[in-house]
């Protein structure tokens, strides 16, 4: 049975490393850093799709490790995570830092983070509309065009944020946002992608 969370136990657990597992919507229409949300895009002709939406609506599983807070630079936690597509789309591996702030005697917390990401997807997808392609090759490229996003770089930035509720001294539940893009630093192609999900986190140690 879950044990009540005291202010002291919440503080103690906040000084330990953590592991977490999450489920995310891959390609969610949510971006809090300035781009406006668009829910009523006009319908495109058959066979065409909006750039950056090729992978929208699929499901990812995320595995995450956080260190205990470091004792400098506002006490960040270093993080390592993999976000694996269950639909054969782009998967991500990231490393970074997260900063956490507790409220309500440690029962609730918010955190923001930034990281660098490598992915197994496409920097640029092959052009299915190039002249002179054999039909089989054109179809192969078109299938990629419909299902995979051109990120413009294999290295991406990963701003992220989450809100957590501590259930007991070891377990917490988080609602999380993960963004991947490169701000057009590496090429003009930069659709970016946003993911929204929920994580179950466990504090390590006794």
Question: What are these language model-derived features?
Answer:
Residues 53-57, 82-93, 104, 118, ...:
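Solvent-exposed loop/turn segments connecting transmembrane beta-strands
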Residues 15-17, 53-61, 89-93, 153-159, ...:
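Residues that define the transmembrane beta-barrel architecture of outer-membrane proteins
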Residues 24-41, 110-160, 164:
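Outer-membrane beta-barrel translocator/channel fold
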Residues 192-206:
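Outer-membrane beta-barrel "beta-signal"
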């Amino acid at each position: 049975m879950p044990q009540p969370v005291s202010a002291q136990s919440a503080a103690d657990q906040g000084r330990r490393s953590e592991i977490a597992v999450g489920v995310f919507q891959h390609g969610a229409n949510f971006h809090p850093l300035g781009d406006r949300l668009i829910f009523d895009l006009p319908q495109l002709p058959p066979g065409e799709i909006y750039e950056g939406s090729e992978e929208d609506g699929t499901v990812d599983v995320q595995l995450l490790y956080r260190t205990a807070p470091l004792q400098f630079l506002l006490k960040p936690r270093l993080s390592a995570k993999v976000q694996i597509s269950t639909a054969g789309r782009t998967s991500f591996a990231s490393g970074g830092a997260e900063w956490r702030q507790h409220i309500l005697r440690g029962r609730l917390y918010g955190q923001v983070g930034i990281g660098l990401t490598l992915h197994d997807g496409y920097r640029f997808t092959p052009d299915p509309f190039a002249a002179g392609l054999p039909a089989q090759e054109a179809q192969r490229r078109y299938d990629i065009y419909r299902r995979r996003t051109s990120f413009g770089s294999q290295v991406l930035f990963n701003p992220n944020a989450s809100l957590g509720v501590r259930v007991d001294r070891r377990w917490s539940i988080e609602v999380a946002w993960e963004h991947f893009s490169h701000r057009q630093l590496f090429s003009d192609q930069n659709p970016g992608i946003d993911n929204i999900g929920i994580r179950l986190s466990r504090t390590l140690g006794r």
